[in-house]
Each structure stands twice: as structure tokens, then as C-alpha cells.
Amino acid sequence: MGEVLIRMENISKEFPGVKALKNVNFEIKKGEVHALVGENGAGKSTLIKILSGVYSKDSGKIYFDGREVEINSPKEAQQLGISVIHQELNLCLHLTVAQNIFLGREFVKNGVIDEKKQNEEAKKILEKLNVNIDPAEYVKNLSVSRQQMVEIAKAISMEAKVIIMDEPTSAISEKETEELFKVIGELKKQGKSIIYISHRLEELNRIVDRVTVLRDGEHIITANFRDLTIDDIIRYMVGRKLEEKYPRVYVNRGKKILEVHGLSQGTRLKDISFDLYEGEILGFAGLVGAGRTEVARAIFGADKFDKGEILINGKKVEINSPIDAIKNGLAYVPEDRKLTGLALNLSVLANITLATMDNVVNMLSVINSVKERKIGEKIIRDLKIKTPSLFQRVQNLSGGNQQKVIVGRWLLREPQIYIFDEPTRGIDVGAKIEIYNILNNLKQEGKGIIVISSELPEIMGITDRVVVMCEGRITAILETSKTTQEEIMYYATLYKKERSN
């Protein structure tokens, strides 16, 4: 690591009703991978948005390569050499890899874009990263991890000195994560600085040099990563020692409430059969693309299936739409809460009552605002949703609080069966435990809960049984207390192994 490249001193930022940052200090050295961690709402995003020119600071100073600078726009940040790779990737899917890399800076010859030259230059950048991607391939045909590589190549093409990566591994597999870490290693060798934001603390020791912890808008500590344990970091993040990472409750399971028999859907799902009991958390494990989300969407009526049957409380039901599923006592919390789970421009209150409007309108279909408000206040209180007010736009909440809003919406309908798809993706360790406690409360109430998760420690920590999938098939249904992560991974790759043999 070299000398300090960026130094932020006493940075403060206030929004209506919220002090987002309070005299925060942060620095990154040349050729350093520096982790920025903290609970949702700690101030990480605000600090990064100030550094990348999205927000202006209220007070404080920023130094770049020894000189004080003002960063008033994303363009000014780019001119300094600061690039951001967001969790939601910023690519044009209908353009090629090369076209995305040089978008707005095309190679032009005789008034026409020189595609050949553009592809050649893109290939050079990708080779520099040791990444094998065809520059002429359309981005829409690439996996999320490959699209990330295109974003990194784009940053390099703009001569980025600092690359900010926001939750880069949240939607990619373990193998793809390894590839990303190799690329980060290459960037480090080239003297690039990486600010790495992640809630997956266990992965940081593989790439990170130093770590800075924020809590409630304040700088808590900056230290060499090797001098801290994961438990130390968690304690600095939440301000207390967490006794249990995966709180568990034991309940005598009740009757069988859901049966799925022979569910098939083209080539995506093949003969899916399983059951779910009252007071049970049933996990679904498997690699990316195994078909877990497809099962959830089929059961909930979001996607059609070709054959098979669904029984609830022993009776066959026809579920052809989400409305049918809701009428039959099912709730679904999707993996992409921002895209399909929330109305981001609406208030917290509107999102909570979205699925139960019949409870808050009178005979003239006019909303009873007093009744609606009481319902919203109860959900916020019961689930400990952190929000300045009921009328705050839900897009301004942290990931963990957004997730609680979706859960609260379904609680009002009192469903019998809950399906959670990646319920803790992109949320911090403290918020994760709050989500686990909500699941445990539902379990104690005798609800049946399906949890789809790509994090095996989470599957092992909170479920009673686990359904393992590979390539659209169920390869095993295991008692969680009697299995291991290694056995789950064996069954998660079973058909891949057979094919390779």
C-alpha cells in the first residue's frame, strides 16, 4: 500500500429529521482494498454518495492526492478518477460489452462509430483484468457476475484510480465471487484503490487490507483487518455483543398444511414434490439457477406450471394467479424487494396497507385515514421499523427496514404459509437477527415458512428441514440437525457431477 490517495475530514450531512453523518473521517491509500461496513442506516451510502458527487456535504473537507477538492457532481468525481459500481448495475442490456464500456466516449472514424477499434480496445482492458468476455457479446446475455466485470472494465477505461464496489457479491455464486476476488487482486497490483462495501463480513478477510466501521452516522474505528476478529467488527457495528447469530426456537410441528406433488414447468422444473408443516421453517438450498425461485413463483401463482398439484390443508387448490394464492392463505416476500416487492415512491404507510385496503376503506370506498394510521403505527411498533414518519418514502429506508415493511404488509392478512426468497440479502447483521426473530415468532404462531437462501450458514442456522435443488430437480430433503454444509453442497451439485463424469 502506498500513501493516502483520498482523505475525508469531519464530513457531516443532514437530511430533514435525520443526521446522516456526524464529523466522519475516512481515508483510502493507493493500492488498498478498504472495507466500509456498518448496519443499514449507519451512513455508508451517504458517505459514498458525497465522495461520488451525488450529494454535497454540509461541512468538512475532502483531499484527493494531497490537494483539497470540491466534488459537486458525479462528472467531477469521474474526472478525479472515482468510479462507483452499484448493487443495481448501471448497464444498457441491449448494447454490446464494448458499447457499454465506451458509452458516451465512442471511437469515431469518418463520422461513424468504429466498432472494430472499440472491440479491440475493450478486449485489451478485459485481458488486463484476466477476464475472458467477448466484447461483441450483448450484455443481456451475460450473468450478473460477468456484467460486474463489464462495469469494472468501464471504470478502468475511464482511468479510475478509486473503484467503489457496493455489495458486489450479494447476487452471485461462490465460484463467481472467487473470480471477482481475482479481478480485485489484479486491480490492486495495478495500484488501484478499492472501497469495498459488504454485509458478508466472513468474505472480507480474503481481500481486505483495512476496515472502517460506521455506526449511527459516526466513525467508530479504522483498523488493519488482520488485527480484528469478525466478532470485534460486529460489536463495533451494533454497539453490543450479539449472543446468537442465528436465534432458534424449538416448536412441536403441527399438521401438514402444504403439499406439492409432481410440479413441472418446461425444462426449468422437473417433478417437484415436498410438504410443509405448521410451526416449521423449511429451507430451500441450491446454486444460482437451481430453480428455487421458480418453485416459489409457481406455488404463488406468479408463473404457470405445466403439471402437478398443490394441496393446502389436505385439499387440492387451483392457484392460477397471486390473487388465488393470497385467497388460499399464502404470502410471498420476493428476492428483489425494490423491483417486485415495494412501491418505492409511495410512503411507508401506503406500502404496509397495500394488500389490505379492504380493511381501511368504508362503504363508499374512501380510505379511513385514522384507521389506516393506527394499523401502520402498530406494524411499525411491532416490527421495530426505523423511519422518521409513516409518510416517509419507502425508498429512503435501509434495506432491513424495507424488508420489514413487506413482512408487515403480509402480517395484516394473517396468511397461513409464508414464502421468503433471500430474506436477508443486502441487509446488515443486526437487521438479519431482527428478521430471524420475526420468522421465529411466525413459527411459534404455527405458521408454515419456506425460506430460500444462498447462504448455507443461514440455512443451517434457522431451518428445521432443507430441500436441496440442482438444475430444476429436488435432489434431497434433509433434517437440518442431522446434515452438514458439505452434504448440502454435494446434493446441490449432484447432476452437474453426474454429467461431468
Curated annotation (Swiss-Prot):
Lineage top rank: taxon: Bacteria
Span of domain ABC transporter: 6-241, 252-496
GO cellular component, one term: plasma membrane
Enzyme class: translocase
Transport is among the record's keywords: yes
Reaction catalyzed: D-ribose(out) + ATP + H2O = D-ribose(in) + ADP + phosphate + H(+); D-galactose(out) + ATP + H2O = D-galactose(in) + ADP + phosphate + H(+)
GO MF annotation terms: ABC-type D-ribose transporter activity; ATP binding; ATP hydrolysis activity
Cross-referenced Gene3D superfamilies: P-loop containing nucleotide triphosphate hydrolases
EC number from the UniProt entry: 7.5.2.11, 7.5.2.7
Record bears the keyword Nucleotidyltransferase: no
InterPro entries, alphabetized: AAA+_ATPase, ABC_carbohydrate_import_ATPase, ABC_transporter-like_ATP-bd, ABC_transporter-like_CS, P-loop_NTPase
Similarity field: Belongs to the ABC transporter superfamily. Carbohydrate importer 2 (CUT2) (TC 3.A.1.2) family.
UniProt protein name: Putative ribose/galactose/methyl galactoside import ATP-binding protein
Organism this protein belongs to: Caldanaerobacter subterraneus subsp. tengcongensis (strain DSM 15242 / JCM 11007 / NBRC 100824 / MB4)
Lineage: Bacteria, Bacillati, Bacillota, Clostridia, Thermoanaerobacterales
